[in-house]
Each structure stands twice: as C-alpha cells, then as structure tokens.
C-alpha cells in the first residue's frame, strides 16, 4: 500500500492547471538550453527492466510520437514547483541501505525514502499526471561531479534540454550540470535507451554528492 506521504504529495502536486491551460505560444524571458547529442541504441538499465516488471503500465505503451514541452512561464513554474516539492519531500537514502542489495531498485517513494532514481521517477510521474507529455520526460544516466553513477530526469522542451536533479533545486540546462551524460530513454519508446556518448557540460561552481 502506498504511504500517506506518497498519496498526499501526489494529490498535492497534480492539483491545479491541466496541460491544455499552458500549451501556449513561447514567451520572452524564459531560459534557453541546447539539445544533448543523441547516438544509437544503448543497453537498458537493469533497474528500468525491474521497474517495468512491477509497473507494466509504464512500459507497454507501444510507439509514441515524439513531443517536446512547450516552455511558457506557467509550464516553467510547474516544473520548478514539482522539482522543489519532490526534492524536499523524499528522505535521501542509498540503494544498499534502502533495499539491502547492490542491484539498482527503481520505484516510487512508497515509504517516503529513496535515492536519485526514486526522485527522478516520481518527478516524471507527477509531471505526467499534470499533463506533460511523457515523450519529453526522459530518465537519464550520468556520472556526477564525483564521477559516480547518478540518475536525473531530462525534460525536452522547445527551448532545449533541461535537467531535474535531486542534488539541485535549480533546474539547469544539461550543459550547466558538469555531468557526463551516458544514456537516456528514447522519446518514441521508453524501453529503448539511446547513447549520449559521455557528453559533458561546463562544470558549475560547486560540487554535490549523490
């Protein structure tokens, strides 16, 4: 059974505007980013396969039409709202301490705890619940500033690719993270992962640990 935190947070952040209320023409004064270079197919993370075994509804969608988020002041506000709420609501804990295994366990924060994958998956779920196109919300594997494996959520927009990260309450262009980007989900199929070739953004001023 889902925890009270999970149910409450889910209900709280999906309440409000539907997607149709903020798909508008782009507005001035919004952030800009570039698009990460995407290569050929990459291996599928074990954690995603395991997640799909427990949440088949997320993984049996068939081919999807690629879509980007239309960035407006309202959609940017919602992205920041969800990024901050999730970052502050989940208690960080390592995969080993949480699940007692070194195998990556991907899931939602059913007990209010989790590591980077749990943060990213929950943000993805809540944004989908708010009407954002799932094709633009891509689980992404990187190496962080300490050279450790890390998962973030890439949001593809008409202003470029932005990163929602449990290590930062600021949503940043992918090039501003300092991370090495290795692979992420394809827009047309969440079960296909594409290589990012270890592309690296310019390092920000401060480091953070996973």
Q: Residue locations for each model-derived region?
A:
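Bacterial N-terminal signal peptides that target proteins for export
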Residues: 1-10
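Bacterial N-terminal signal peptides
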Residues: 9-19
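A structural boundary/capping signal
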Residues: 2, 24-210
